[in-house]
């Protein structure tokens, strides 16, 4: 359930989800497929002021999740899906303030603590940007950009990622993933800029790799030979 799927006017959070649940069923639930346990949560929390919501998991859902996972053996693979991310990229973190509490889950520490005994992957979205964030050795968040790009106004999301979707494959309890740009082959994974075509990058080669994470080691090759390890930085594409 996303922030555009709820009623954003009324007097309470409970009223904001009623229409969605009347048509589609519960806004949080779980199921098993193979060796993986999947959980869907709703962290779009309407606070009773028209069009104002925050990223927040109510205590009712957290208690339900604790009960649900009590049937899942520790060490199992768990995939948790919700809309507003529980982590921020470095760029988004610099922008975070109380007035932007709808950008990330405000009480994420409680969720992360519940997931600690498991090999957990979080799938989220909302920001129209892409980043992968290792939270701990056993918890990894995938923030997936929008299929609509810049709200159907352009082919790129706000960080330069082409509009598209995440592809996840599961083998037993092992999860693999990659980003797939709409209308592009699976190996289309970056935009490359150099100083010849882009004067602002004179003396540099810049690679915007959409599905990378902070632990990636990116090596540049030229004419079949290594030109060195590329330095990671945060910027807008």
PLM regions with names:
Residues 1-74, 93-123, 129-171, 175-178:
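Extended active-site neighborhood of metal-dependent phosphoesterases/phosphodiesterases
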Residues 2, 43, 83, 212, ...:
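Cofactor-binding loop segments of dinucleotide-utilizing enzymes, especially the Rossmann-like FAD-
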Residues 91, 188, 229-231:
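Outer-membrane beta-barrel proteins
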Residues 139-225:
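Binuclear metal-dependent phosphoesterase catalytic core
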Residues 226-237:
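Solvent-exposed serine/threonine-rich low-complexity stretches and specific carbohydrate-binding patches
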């Amino acid at each position: 359930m996303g922030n555009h799927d709820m009623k954003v006017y009324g007097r309470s959070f409970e009223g904001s989800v009623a229409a969605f649940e009347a048509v589609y069923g519960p806004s949080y639930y779980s199921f098993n497929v193979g060796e993986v346990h999947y959980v869907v949560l709703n962290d779009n929390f309407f606070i009773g002021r028209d069009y104002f919501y925050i990223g927040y998991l109510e205590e009712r859902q957290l208690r339900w999740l604790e009960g649900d996972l009590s049937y899942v053996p520790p060490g199992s693979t768990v995939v948790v899906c919700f809309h507003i991310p529980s982590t921020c990229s470095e760029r988004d973190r610099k922008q975070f303030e109380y007035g932007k509490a709808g950008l990330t889950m405000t009480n994420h520490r409680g969720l992360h603590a519940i997931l600690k005994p498991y090999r957990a992957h979080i799938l989220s979205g909302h920001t129209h940007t892409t980043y992968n964030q290792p939270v701990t050795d056993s918890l990894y968040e995938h923030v997936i950009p929008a299929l609509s790009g810049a709200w159907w106004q352009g082919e790129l999301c706000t960080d330069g990622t082409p509009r598209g979707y995440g592809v996840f494959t599961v083998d037993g309890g092992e999860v693999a993933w990659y980003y797939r740009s709409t209308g592009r082959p699976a190996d289309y994974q970056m935009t490359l800029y150099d100083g010849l075509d882009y004067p602002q990058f004179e003396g540099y080669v810049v690679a915007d790799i959409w599905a990378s994470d902070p632990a990636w080691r990116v090596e540049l090759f030229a004419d079949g030979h290594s030109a060195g390890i590329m330095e990671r930085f945060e910027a807008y594409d």
